[in-house]
Amino acid sequence: MATLYDNEAKIKQAIVLLQKVVNDTSVPRNIRRAASDAIRNLQDPSLSPAVRAANATAILDEISQDPNMPSQTRISIWNVVSILETIRD
């Protein structure tokens, strides 16, 4: 049961970091939209934490290849992905 709380804490931490990306107007709109989609996936209560993390990681991994992404945003995305990759059921 402790891992469930750990997973939820990691998801909340990832959401906070992604919210910063969404609220940063210097980030291109398509990247902010992908971050919003990832947040929506992370907040979906019908899926297990690992599935939510995997879905969000797929979105973020795809968008992290965008050449228009500012470097500080890319680092934030990578940090979120590394947090989400530690989530297991």
From Swiss-Prot:
Protein name per UniProt: UPF0147 protein Msed_2034
InterPro entries recorded: Ta0600-like_sf, UPF0147
Protein origin, superkingdom: Archaea
Signal peptide: none
Pfam families noted in UniProt: UPF0147
Organism: Metallosphaera sedula (strain ATCC 51363 / DSM 5348 / JCM 9185 / NBRC 15509 / TH2)
Similarity comment: Belongs to the UPF0147 family.
Gene3D superfamilies referenced in this protein's UniProt entry, alphabetically: Ta0600-like
Residues that span the membrane, as ranges: none
